[in-house]
Amino acid sequence: MVQIEKVFGREIIDSRGNPAVEVDITLVGGYFGRAACPSGASTGTHEAIEKRDGDFRFFGKGVKKAVEAINTDIRKSLLGMDSTDQPAVDNQLISLDGTDNKGHLGANAILPVSMAVARAASQALQVPLYEHLADRTYLLPVPYMNILNGGAHANWQGADFQEYMIAPVGAPDFPEAVRWGCEVYHTLKAILKKRGLSTGVGDEGGFAPKVSSNRAPLDFITEAIEMAGYKPGKDISLALDPASSEFYSDGVYELKSEGKKLSSEEMTGYYEDMVAVYPIISIEDGLSEDDWNGWIAMTKAIGKKVQLVGDDIFVTNTKRISRGISEKAANAVLIKLNQIGTVTETISAVTMARNAGWSSMISHRSGETVDSFIADLTVSLGTGQIKTGAPCRGERVEKYNQLMRIHEELGSRATYAGKKREIRHL
């Protein structure tokens, strides 16, 4: 037992220049953990609540109230607790909040405390964070690199779809996967520049050019893969996150870049046509967060051809994931810690998905910090997939760099997921 001695929260800024919460945890013996909470741009309606001040500071986005809660109520409730008992700490935080959606204290107050405790405990136990949280063989994930941005991440200046990703499934190990991704990223930049398109980057480091259709980015990326010396589909596959809740209204999906208005069935057909032409292995949030019937039909139609990842529809919430499993809506879950609010609840979500034969993908948020917690979490849980942006911008590459450090530390004890990533439905 290593008791929590000090709890301290502060306001910092994230990768978009918005306030975020950072927490320091000190244990008896001087062991220390620090963690920061990210924030999303396209957030699901059913996510845990993020508390903002709503006053004149930072146009209402300040987090002083969340920090105050950490330094008063949360501090008092955690002092003296055993830091190595993560479920007990998290259950104490959940009980203190007393709501289903973290609406009292705010997920942005609770999560960084939960993460910082885990980090401090790993230091006290003198083991790496990924080992402290681990419950299985170590698996280094396939990095899903968002190298071209559209939708809300590019201020709606180009494609309707929010993220176009590459997945180096054919790489022999994680460092090589990162190298392949970087080479494709730089090649894509040269292609866009040659065509007179913008090479400015969006929130997650991907390029954000103005394009005339949702297929154009796939053509650019496929060309970049080939020009970099790799084979599309064999070495490097593609993945999409349309974030379709952002362009869904009154039962209609409006693709403004192409002047189309589609039903759920037509949207599914739209994806099916794409999968037939391009080496797409994963589609996240292909339909809206509350279009359950559409998700069920889409899973039945194309779920054996491609991974269908639920983000906004599940929001890392076991109640919603359980419904999805029962109704066969999707076949994979995106995992974002701040959607649910504690490390323990996050692990429960991954466990539920795994027990149902579903895969999981650990994810960053568009408003990030340099905290690399999710890198360790991905390895410890063996999800085999991580989504943390382009190989650009410090808050993105820190996760990749941490995973390369873990690869180095584990040596032969680790396996790169590659084409054997934890996807059991295919």
Swiss-Prot record:
One record GO biological process: glycolytic process
Binding site for (2R)-2-phosphoglycerate: Q162, K336, R365, S366, K387
Keyword Transport attached: no
Keyword vocabulary terms for this entry: Cytoplasm, Glycolysis, Lyase, Magnesium, Metal-binding, Secreted
Catalytic reaction annotation: (2R)-2-phosphoglycerate = phosphoenolpyruvate + H2O
Parts of the chain that traverse the membrane: none
Similarity section: Belongs to the enolase family.
GO molecular function per UniProt: magnesium ion binding; phosphopyruvate hydratase activity
Organism: Methanospirillum hungatei JF-1 (strain ATCC 27890 / DSM 864 / NBRC 100397 / JF-1)
Domain of life of the native organism: Archaea
HAMAP family attached to this UniProt entry: Enolase
Catalytic residues (positions): E204 (proton donor), K336 (proton acceptor)
Residues given in the record as Mg(2+) binding sites: D241, E284, D311
Pfam families: Enolase_C, Enolase_N
Pathway(s): Carbohydrate degradation; glycolysis; pyruvate from D-glyceraldehyde 3-phosphate: step 4/5
Record lineage: Archaea, Methanobacteriati, Methanobacteriota, Stenosarchaea group, Methanomicrobia
GO cellular component: cell surface; extracellular region; phosphopyruvate hydratase complex
Xref: Gene3D superfamilies: Enolase-like C-terminal domain, Enolase-like, N-terminal domain
E.C. number(s) listed in UniProt: 4.2.1.11
Localization terms from the record: Cytoplasm; Secreted; Cell surface
The protein, known as: Enolase 1
InterPro entries membership: Enolase, Enolase-like_C_sf, Enolase-like_N, Enolase_C, Enolase_CS, Enolase_N
Cofactor, how bound (note): Binds a second Mg(2+) ion via substrate during catalysis.
Obligatory cofactor(s): Mg(2+)
Protein role: Catalyzes the reversible conversion of 2-phosphoglycerate (2-PG) into phosphoenolpyruvate (PEP). It is essential for the degradation of carbohydrates via glycolysis.
